Amino acid sequence: MQYKEVAGGICAPKGFAAAGVHCGIRANHSEKYDLALIKAEVRCAAAGVYTTNKVCGAPIKVDRAHLTDGYAQAIVVNSGNANTCAANGVALAEECCALVGKALNIDEKDVLPASTGVIGQPMVIDPFARGIPAAAEKLAATAQGSTDAATAIMTTDTHKKEYAIQFELGGKVCTVGAIGKGSGMIAPNMATMLAFYTTDAAVSPALLEKALKTVVPGTYNQMSVDLDTSTNDTLIIMASGLAGNPEICEENADYAAFVAALTAIAEHMCAEHAGDGEGATHLITCEVTHAPDLKTARAVSRSVVCSNLFKAAVFGRDANWGRILCAIGYTPGDFSIDKV
């Protein structure tokens, strides 16, 4: 399938605007953006996947509740405070949604919150009460709007992460855009990262969720930097349907093409996350061929890229390929090491 890379990030698809502002969540960073807002013109099919950590951030609990009907219209994200292990965390996340709902004149239940930053720190509503109206006023359906939002969600990242591609569905040009953050606490099974996708493809909520959960295991769940899985990992997608393609309501050729496009953009974003790992000087990718099944292939690649011994060899430019065999050897699964 052919894809065309386009500018605009999450604002490249039809029907989306974004903004980033400084509102004071990062008290010691007087100018740094720390609040992002993404808004859709229409109520969108939406889906999300989240951390596997048993300790999860309060925004994730709110997201799960708000996404029970499969629809959303806005996303609000802060950096600098994870809103995790705070006594008032869920109430504060809900209050943020109410502020967004009021500022955008939409149902607060159609707002999805996300947070990233320090775990266990107190959090108050005052910065949000200032920042959300300011972000709503600044919303722009432009490349700059996407860039500002991508910048606002950064923590230890060294650069912003955004991408967009176009492809064809049902004779219509469709676009998928993404922004993300995360360079530390990254391990298999989603790890310290936030990612927000927008698309103008028309996809039913059920098929959008299925597509997302099909893509994540082979992309985000295979990514590793330091083997720490965060409490706040979140990947959310909203689909406006404004491209005008026939709505994808069954697993047909258009569905397969949509999954392929999502996979392509997810692979690009994962490379951005891993390549920007805290202290990283190399980006390692592992391709497994002739495995007996997909489960084994993923397990082998995960063992290799997670091996600290192998990472040390790569860092030291030491061609110690025995460390690869060692990592393969302790992988669960039935395969012949003699064929490696």
Predicted regions and their residues:
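A structural signal for small-residue-enriched, beta-sheet-centric alpha/beta enzyme cores
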Residues: M1-A91, E95, G101-V340
